[in-house]
């Protein structure tokens, strides 16, 4: 079993009862090369997530455009049902092109809006 690490202390989000360890885990590298597609070694990606949680990390930063969709799906597959104190944060509005490009973020004023992307991000990490 992993020894819980000293991760820089913790803080409570203002106005909430949510207490976060200062050191989180950024999930961008769970995706494949160029942050596209699945990782070369899915089992290793799963092991990294499990080790982060075992070390005391209680918040994960992710996004639906990592992969796209890949990191959120790996997080859900690995950690669901989620620990009560785990906080998953995401970014909304950005998109990836079919050519693996990083497209500009959508604004709420654009005709297609963010709704379809926002829903995909939430769908992939929730029950």
What function would you assign to each model-found segment?
Residues 99-127:
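Glycine/proline-rich, positively charged
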Residues 1-90, 94-98:
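N-terminal binding-site loop/beta-alpha segment at the start of enzyme catalytic domains
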């Amino acid at each position: 079993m992993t020894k819980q690490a000293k991760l820089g202390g913790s803080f409570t989000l203002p106005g909430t009862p949510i207490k976060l360890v200062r050191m989180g885990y950024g999930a961008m590298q769970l995706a494949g090369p160029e942050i596209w597609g699945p990782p070369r070694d899915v089992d290793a990606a799963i092991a990294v997530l499990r080790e982060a949680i075992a070390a005391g990390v209680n918040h994960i930063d992710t996004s639906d455009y990592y992969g796209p969709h890949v990191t959120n799906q790996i997080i859900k597959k690995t950690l669901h049902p989620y620990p009560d104190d785990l906080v998953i944060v995401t970014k909304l509005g950005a998109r990836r092109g079919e050519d693996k490009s990083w497209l500009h973020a959508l604004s709420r004023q654009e005709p297609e809006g963010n709704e379809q992307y926002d829903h995909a991000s939430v769908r992939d990490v929730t029950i």
